[in-house]
């Protein structure tokens, strides 16, 4: 399914990962790039793909955003022939997750949720504080520009704090684990 979706025009896709290392997935992304698909990846950790290589991956960009939080986004946005589709997944696309575990990959159908997730993705694409872009030689260069600083993680963290304060949730409750070894539940 995933491999069919990345080939449908208009040709653009966006995927945030923690890790991208599976050779079959990387090969299909290369094939999509060669076919003219614009692929934007946000890969926080290990990335076995090489972006921006002429004739192979010039239509692929890889950005890494490292900040205060360790995130595990698994969002897949497909332009899908003009009918945009958004999916969420429970796994990074590493062999151990795809071969040895039961994982979920499901569509987001609520327009309200789609809108919110796209706002978050846009925020990550505008990040110019913790973002680094992969160069064609595999190294990363920090995103620098003179625009107003944008930190996706800080913005989302502050938004969550404001929402919790508006709900008048005490700090000790907000930061307490729901389950611990001492839980009665």
Located regions from the model:
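Short, small-residue-biased leader/transition segments that mark boundaries at the very start
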Residues: 5-20
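PLD/PLD-like phosphodiesterase catalytic module centered on the HKD motif
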Residues: 18-185
